[in-house]
Amino acid sequence: MGDRVTVGIVGASGYGGVQLVRLLLEHPKVDIVYLGGEGSAGRPYTELYPHLQGRVNLTVEPVSVEVIRDRAQVVFLSLPNGIACQLAPQLLEQGCKVLDLSADYRFQDLQTYTQWYGEPREDQATAQKAVYGLPELYRDRIRQSALIGCPGCYPTASLLALAPLMKQGLIEPNTAIIDAKSGTSGGGRQGKINLLLAEADNSLAPYNVARHRHTPEIEAICSDLAGQSVLVQFTPHLVPMPRGILATVYATLRDPGLVREDLITIYQAFYRHSPWVNILPPGLYPQTKWAWGTNACFIGIEVDERTGRVIVMSAIDNLMKGQASQAVQCLNLMMGWPETMGLPQVAFYP
């Protein structure tokens, strides 16, 4: 595709979109040539995000498959659920590579999608072509695909914590409990009462208990890894901070003789080719601040010998590894570039 790749972003006005813009501006192999969105069409992008003055000279345009086709080789879709599935088939037909940040192409079984998201779908053939965009698990498939269904933020943190346990049969698979906490940016940029400072500050609250839409996504990938149907218990919480996810996973070990050091060695081996996953040494547990602004995931491991359970803690930036930078990581793989290319390596600290 030549030395540089032209990229369009549809849904550029949201938090996911602006993270993509920030990352792709610094990417050595990419040129942003199109920013699309219906609600903000006609407005200079710097009117939406003034901090990008002098860096972005594009105006947000109405969404047009023909315009995108003529300009962009790769398209990121950062749209609400149920919209990407209307655009992706058309873009693929025009020869574009597509990375979808919504839930539309995370499921091979569209009945599951319809059950949890309430949207009937008629694009089963397209969904079958999609690859789940978690590079640490599906790196080789991503390299060969033209359509990536990028994971949700909670599933990313949860699955990176669970994958070695599920894949290697180290736990009773249906005993997994995920307690996850996310910053307020996970709710998007549109005004919501529970995300107002007066509502969210100095408070910690669970939400969508036993019915969060990321549950079937986690279960589908766990089932694939375990080679059997898996159910998980997943409870998300809202934390009064702008970004970050900490997922704490509990599960019963099949071999109660496994100790913490054994599991750390297993995790290090499992992720030995994954530059963004950091397995912490014994007694050190992850903090969300360590991942701020990066594509990193920090994983800490503990074993409670008294209960026979393993406890795995996983910290990511929900807008980065949980959304935009993971999509860019997938782009790197699709194009045959190093998967670290153009992505921040070190967090802002403190």
Curated annotation (Swiss-Prot):
A GO MF term: NAD binding
Q: Can the keyword Cytoplasm be found in this entry's annotation?
A: yes
Sorted alphabetically, the keyword list is:
Amino-acid biosynthesis, Arginine biosynthesis, Cytoplasm, NADP, Oxidoreductase
Listed SUPFAM superfamilies: Glyceraldehyde-3-phosphate dehydrogenase-like, C-terminal domain, NAD(P)-binding Rossmann-fold domains
Q: Name where it's found.
A: Cytoplasm
Tell me which residues this entry annotates as catalytic.
C153
Which pathway, per its entry? Amino-acid biosynthesis; L-arginine biosynthesis; N(2)-acetyl-L-ornithine from L-glutamate: step 3/4
Q: What does this protein do?
A: Catalyzes the NADPH-dependent reduction of N-acetyl-5-glutamyl phosphate to yield N-acetyl-L-glutamate 5-semialdehyde.
- Protein name in UniProt: N-acetyl-gamma-glutamyl-phosphate reductase
The species is Thermosynechococcus vestitus (strain NIES-2133 / IAM M-273 / BP-1)
Q: Tell me the organism's taxonomic lineage.
A: Bacteria, Bacillati, Cyanobacteriota, Cyanophyceae, Acaryochloridales
